[in-house]
């Protein structure tokens, strides 16, 4: 059967597409390694360097002169303390904005990825989106020459807009060009490219490579390289045959695209499947985001999709490096950054493993195994951290639990939500479904980025256990009752919901 064939054109198209996913991961991880270097630069630009703050304290403690004030007569020490606290708060504010502006941009743009893909086509939409990527990279790359805090915040926000667009575009495109039997494995490559980008950003962010006072701006602007490469390669990639056939009704172009992707003239099965989907789509009105929740045919699939993304984000995976650093320091590792890179490497390896497992073990099974494993690891992490002061050897228990936590995440909860949404819906509601799912993911990302430190301060070592206790029932209540057939992953799930919707209507009429 030709549908199982992996052709050079398919490899080129998927590789080119997931360069966007790589940029996504790179932009997530690149800001972490040079944190202290960038904060030091912020102090210099804003005139509140560490040396200045020390000088203020020394002056306040040793001088007998009155310091100017408009708020009565505080002592020199209180004036200096207030000045120091204000300076520290200013730096913290700009650093927090530098990190979180990326997620804000992603939240805003996530609604428009599918819509842009429908308006311009998948290839042209990616070309247009790369304009944002290049602008963001250039702002960050030249941030050392101007007001760095403003340029980095702006660049991160614009890069977030780009990543928000592609978080809907890439799963849609690679899901539409992939052969049916390889759709899950190819869909998982989106997540693999993301974690690879995170790992590469951690490596090149080492202080002896680019994460130092001289080269940190180049580190931030380096995402322009995959953006330029993708722009060049996109001219050689075929447009989505599903988009051409179903959306534009251009059968000849769709067949040409399919023949390139399949490497054969025998495309009867693909055309038959798309023809059936087009007939069904022609009977469907344009589906809005609101209709996904009000229409019984779409309600359960979209709720499942949202819960999958919520469970992914609120599992605590994005906060894992907060505790890993302290644990590795406690274990006596002089350079905990290398241990963190080790976690990133495990992250990448097990994502690659999931690519091969997803078609054999099934989506639901892998998600269940992953969530169950993370739940157990969270317990061991919490126990290890609670007992660390009494039993120093418990740090090794926590270290092992962190590595296993990441491994279980990438077996299922990491990659599966991204491509499952494209499989749940037909061509009509798919763009709206991808938009709302991407928005859900970005919203969870932003909430964790903004609140994790406060939750960790309040809950201490129980933070991961608490997050998983919250996300587990969300997953169970929606995903366990959703039986997803294997034979037609693009339509069977929705048809099942449509039948239930018809049955509900009949019951109401009776």
Curated annotation (Swiss-Prot):
Regulation: D-glucose and maltose competitively inhibit fructose transport. D-glucose, D-fructose and maltose inhibit deoxyglucose transport.
Major site of localization recorded for this protein: membrane
Family matches, as SUPFAM superfamilies: MFS general substrate transporter
Lineage: superkingdom: Eukaryota
Transmembrane intervals: 11-31, 97-117, 123-143, 158-178, 192-212, 216-236, 302-322, 337-357, 366-386, 401-421, 432-452, 455-475
GO biological process, one term: D-glucose transmembrane transport
Subcellular localization, as worded in the UniProt entry: Cell membrane
Post-translational modification (record): N-glycosylated; required for stability and retention at the cell surface of pancreatic beta cells.
Function: Facilitative hexose transporter that mediates the transport of glucose, fructose and galactose. Likely mediates the bidirectional transfer of glucose across the plasma membrane of hepatocytes and is responsible for uptake of glucose by the beta cells; may comprise part of the glucose-sensing mechanism of the beta cell. May also participate with the Na(+)/glucose cotransporter in the transcellular transport of glucose in the small intestine and kidney. Also able to mediate the transport of dehydroascorbate.
The protein's name: Solute carrier family 2, facilitated glucose transporter member 2
Gene name per UniProt: SLC2A2
């Amino acid at each position: 059967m030709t549908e199982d064939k992996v052709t050079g054109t398919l490899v080129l198209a998927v590789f080119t597409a997931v360069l966007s996913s790589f940029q996504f991961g790179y932009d997530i991880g690149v800001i972490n390694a040079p944190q202290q270097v960038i904060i030091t630069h912020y102090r210099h630009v804003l005139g509140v360097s560490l040396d200045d703050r020390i000088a203020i304290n020394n002056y306040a403690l040793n001088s007998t002169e009155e310091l100017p004030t408009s708020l009565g007569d505080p002592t020199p020490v209180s004036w200096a303390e207030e000045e120091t606290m204000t300076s520290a708060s200013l730096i913290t504010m700009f650093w927090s904005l530098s990190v979180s502006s990326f997620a804000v941009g992603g939240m805003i743009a996530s609604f428009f990825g599918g819509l842009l893909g429908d308006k311009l086509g998948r290839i042209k939409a990616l070309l247009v989106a790369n304009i944002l990527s290049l602008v963001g990279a250039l702002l960050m790359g030249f941030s050392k020459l101007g007001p760095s805090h403003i340029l980095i915040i702006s660049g991160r926000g614009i890069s977030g807009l780009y990543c928000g667009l592609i978080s809907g575009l890439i799963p849609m495109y690679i899901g539409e060009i992939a052969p049916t039997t390889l759709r899950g494995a190819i869909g998982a490559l989106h997540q693999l490219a993301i974690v690879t980008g995170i790992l590469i950003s951690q490596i090149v962010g080492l202080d002896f490579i680019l994460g130092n006072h001289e080269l940190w701006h180049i580190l931030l602007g380096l995402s322009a390289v995959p953006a330029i490469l993708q722009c060049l390669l996109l001219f050689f990639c075929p447009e989505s045959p599903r988009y051409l056939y179903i959306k534009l009704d251009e059968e000849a172009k769709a067949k040409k695209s399919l023949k390139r992707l399949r490497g054969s003239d025998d495309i009867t099965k693909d055309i038959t499947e798309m023809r059936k989907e087009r007939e069904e789509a022609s009977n469907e009105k344009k589906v809005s985001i609101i209709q996904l929740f009000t229409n019984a045919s779409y309600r359960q699939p979209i709720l499942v999709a949202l819960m999958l993304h919520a469970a992914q984000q609120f599992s605590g995976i994005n906060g894992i490096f907060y505790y890993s650093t302290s644990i590795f320091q406690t274990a006596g590792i002089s350079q905990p950054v290398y241990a963190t890179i080790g976690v990133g490497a495990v992250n990448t390896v097990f994502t690659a493993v999931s690519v091969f497992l997803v078609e054999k073990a099934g989506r639901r099974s892998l998600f269940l195994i992953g969530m169950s494993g993370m739940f157990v690891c969270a317990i061991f992490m919490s126990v290890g951290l609670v007992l660390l002061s009494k039993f120093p050897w418990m740090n090794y228990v926590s270290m092992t639990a962190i590595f296993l936590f990441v491994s279980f995440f990438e077996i299922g909860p990491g990659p599966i939500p991204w491509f499952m949404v494209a499989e749940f819906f037909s061509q009509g509601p798919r763009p709206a479904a991808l938009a709302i799912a991407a928005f859900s993911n970005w919203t969870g990302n932003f909430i964790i980025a903004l609140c994790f430190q406060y939750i960790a301060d309040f809950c201490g070592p129980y933070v991961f256990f608490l997050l998983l206790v919250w996300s587990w029932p969300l997953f169970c209540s929606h995903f366990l009752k959703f039986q997803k057939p294997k034979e037609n992953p693009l339509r069977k799930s929705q048809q099942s919901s449509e039948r239930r919707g018809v049955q509900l209507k009949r019951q109401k009429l009776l």
